[in-house]
């Protein structure tokens, strides 16, 4: 199993009172006491960050009050793989009838929730096939905050929608999305257990980040496969800064930048979605601090990557904190938390090999 830099006890304490909730395959499993990545192009919408629930419904990422149906039996998702992962996490796998193809290309997600394979692909965001959606006869659809045009077309079919934060996510809006999804899907106990997990991990992350001295904060650059492919989305800034890092580029900086610009930023750490060894060997950037020190990392990938909004993202915060500040974050055992999360929320026992695969890119 791969060695991580986090070696002490974990913080998550998931309540056993949320036991026997139906998840994958319609089977119930007990939530035992446990100890222990799709960013689209963001638009200007501001995700709702106030109370997750309204008097007669829930409030989505667009600030709309969405009525809670008596039941939801046929679910459509049109916001990449993370939306499907969210639905599965909160008990909706058996009810999926429409899901983007990206979810089917996530091996571990598909292994845990094989029901995804039977859902039809109707596209994503604004590029959706309305005829395919209509033919699947969903009675509810989870959509993205970045796709007003596609969402409106779905609503014209008379299908109620809930807008997930996706690329516009903040820490608070994501937490609200997951609470609300559990309410909509009729699994509020699972939502309560999840928020207990979230609050413990994110609280531990915040506490650890506070111990990082101002003059010891590391500058972090996030890129694609090439060093010149900047990928400092707003979410990347949230991720980096929440653990005590400093974003090298202004949040929202994406696309081509020059090697000279990266050299001027001179990041202490580089996060990449590409090949780590290729970046370390790039002759153009050998004088950059991160390259000199071998501080180039790629986020772990579970059912989805840990560097993008998804239910596994608290694990991503803890992991990144440990890469930047191993001593400050030594109190969170990320591997143990990952195993507990999969058991408690997916009803799935990770093998040692699967756990190693999740962390192997890091």
Task: List each language-model region with its residue ranges.
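N-terminal secretory signal peptides and thylakoid transit peptides that target proteins
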Residues: 2-19
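C-terminal segment of N-terminal export signals and the immediately downstream linker at the start
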Residues: 27-57
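Short helix-initiation/N-cap motifs at beta->coil->alpha
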Residues: 61-63, 119-131, 252-260
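Structural recognition of the beta-strand scaffold that forms the well-ordered cores
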Residues: 76-78, 97-100, 140-144, 162-164, ...
